[in-house]
């Protein structure tokens, strides 16, 4: 065990001896960030991919399956902005981010206790716990995004996050394969209980690694002041809300990106519960098949990351976002005409390559669109806005089945995804036009 720890420490340090300079500290932090991502996805992938099948084994209804997506989104609406304000007030953000992460991972132990509930309450207990789990989960996600944006400078992000995502997908898929096989091998519900407890233990290792990131290597950033009360009294709530809305309106680039993202996320997430229902109820997928689908998806993503990094470095974040999102209509289109899990698995290679670009560009475009001042709060505003889409989308998806069959529902979802992708093309054109006007005005001023 000590040999493994020494080997990991050697990898993190990059083989360098003595006191590291600024460049070496950055490289070390980037390596730790990648390793943290591996253990993070290992813990999460022992739980998240199998929740829908777990719910159906607990006799959950279609509406309850949809609530596995909508419930966490509803909870996060009330968590992200207060959490972001709290994080923004911290000079050092790592400790608070870790506490949010630990609180989120502790819910894995609560999930393991669901079989002890009365059978009629188990499905609702799962829905409630998954929703409540997102209270610290959404806070930790917002805090991590703000924290890591300070650790990794803009010119290093494309490569750094591509490497992180590549290793996360690779090791995450290995974990899903092993977990799926174990779940199908062990009797229900023992397998799920074992997996949820193992996920929590893995999360403890994850947090230990995250704590190794050197926050002092990041540029100094003073905490956001709490604000001085006017005449000894705090400003009324509506006045504070109005002030924040005015601040957001003064960031047109951010507002455009938020509106486009809301429409995109709505179109992206509508078919999510339909995929799970179709896989299990129509194509009769088990946990092993969920693992196989993840494996094929990862195979495509490992190829895709290198391609999309090159596109991003050449064309920028927004164009890359459009170039990648325009193809995600293929996923519901394949489901509309697929009657075999093997067909879905084969096309998952292609969709994995596509979504590696989507995930990479979404995150980098967000960091680019948010102002440096109060960055955590702006990230929370963004996440809150797209969460509204996440609340509505699964219900719309399940609702489509009340009016049409799976095939037509998937075709409608494919059309909506094309419309969602076009939103990013629109804001890219608007920004190019504004940049052109700014350049022309500058030329006129110089010639005057």
Stretch-by-stretch model annotation:
Residues 49-57, 85, 112-118, 172-196, ...:
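Transmembrane alpha-helix termini and helix-breaking/packing motifs in multi-pass membrane transporters
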Residues 62-63, 154-164, 287-288, 370-382:
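Loop-to-transmembrane helix entry/capping segments in MFS-fold secondary transporters
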Residues 2-78, 87, 94, 98-104, ...:
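Helix-loop boundary and gating motifs at the non-cytosolic
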Residues 137-152, 357-371:
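Intracellular juxtamembrane helix-capping segments at the cytosolic ends
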Residues 2-27, 217-259, 441-448:
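Juxtamembrane intracellular "pre-TM" segments in multi-pass secondary transporters
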Residues 192, 207-226, 425-438:
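Helix-loop junctions on the cytosolic side of multi-pass membrane transporters
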Residues 95-111, 197, 319-334, 411-414:
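Structural signature of the two symmetry-related core transmembrane helices
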Residues 78-95, 183-184, 303-317, 401:
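Helix-to-loop junctions at the C-terminal end of transmembrane segments
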